[in-house]
Amino acid sequence: MSYLEAIILGLVQGLTEFLPISSSAHLRIAGLFMGGDPGATFTAITQLGTELAVVVFFRKRIGKVLSAWSRSLRGGMPKGDPDVRMGWLVIIGTIPIGIAGYLFQDTIRSTFRSLWIVAIVLIVFGILLGLADRYSRSDRLEKDMTYGHGVSIGIAQALALVPGVSRSGATTTAARAFGYSRPVAAEYSFLLAVPAVFGSGLYELVKSFDETGQAGAGQTAVATLIAFIVGLAVIAGLMRYISTRTFMPFVVYRVALGVVLLVLLGTGAIAA
């Protein structure tokens, strides 16, 4: 992988991580034009850049949650405090993806990366997002979120281990299905992703510095930095967008991309 290709993949990661269109699917597709799949390890490590963008953008909220949660363990904060509850909601919501990632890590690296699977789940989960966003109530706020909902949204996040599902798309779909407003759904989705993505990214980084697909350490670092810069801008833009608009443009894009992939695969224009 050249540095130019690393920059392009970093741009793709940064542009697509927070939109409900699946960054891993787009990295997989981009690999078609760059001589091969960049790999699950490369994807996991570059996601560290976009999750660092989440930490920077939500630094005040994350700081409050961490402070309140840690103080509650010592009896210094009531368990019903909103920030304490959010801390527990993030923890319990992270458990499903931790279990699934450990149990299915080999399948994630191989079978799940088939473009046939990517195309199908782009369409299916795009339709689910559209239905949840269109027909669900939108009046539930963060204070209404139950631990049961947190676990359910966490299970949705675990499904995003399959490229094409989209971490933000799956968690937002689940939250919208439970009736939470778009800003609440998006913020919880972002906060929920932090421990999961940092965990998987650091695990892959420590596990092997030479298992980053065709990318070397330098190229991976460049892609991660680009993903951070672009991702920070995308978060800000998305939070403004969803305050007044729906997810329907992303639904249309997902379905269209999935259909195009199926046609290209069916005609033999591209290989799975």
From Swiss-Prot:
Keywords: Antibiotic resistance, Cell membrane, Cell shape, Cell wall biogenesis/degradation, Hydrolase, Membrane, Peptidoglycan synthesis, Transmembrane, Transmembrane helix
Reactions the enzyme catalyzes: di-trans,octa-cis-undecaprenyl diphosphate + H2O = di-trans,octa-cis-undecaprenyl phosphate + phosphate + H(+)
Membrane topology of this protein: Multi-pass membrane protein
InterPro entries hit by this protein: UppP
Residues in the signal sequence: none
Coiled coil region boundaries: none
Principal subcellular localisation of the protein: membrane
Lineage: superkingdom: Bacteria
Enzyme Commission number: 3.6.1.27
Single annotated GO MF: undecaprenyl-diphosphatase activity
Record field: transmembrane: 1-21, 38-58, 84-104, 112-132, 145-165, 183-203, 219-239, 250-270
GO cellular component: a single term: plasma membrane
Family membership: Belongs to the UppP family.
Miscellaneous note of the record: Bacitracin is thought to be involved in the inhibition of peptidoglycan synthesis by sequestering undecaprenyl diphosphate, thereby reducing the pool of lipid carrier available.
NCBIfam families (UniProt xref): PRK00281.2-1 (NF001392), undec_PP_bacA (TIGR00753)
Function text: Catalyzes the dephosphorylation of undecaprenyl diphosphate (UPP). Confers resistance to bacitracin.
Name of the molecule in the record: Undecaprenyl-diphosphatase
Organism name: Clavibacter michiganensis subsp. michiganensis (strain NCPPB 382)
Lineage: Bacteria, Bacillati, Actinomycetota, Actinomycetes, Micrococcales
Encoding gene, per UniProt annotation: uppP
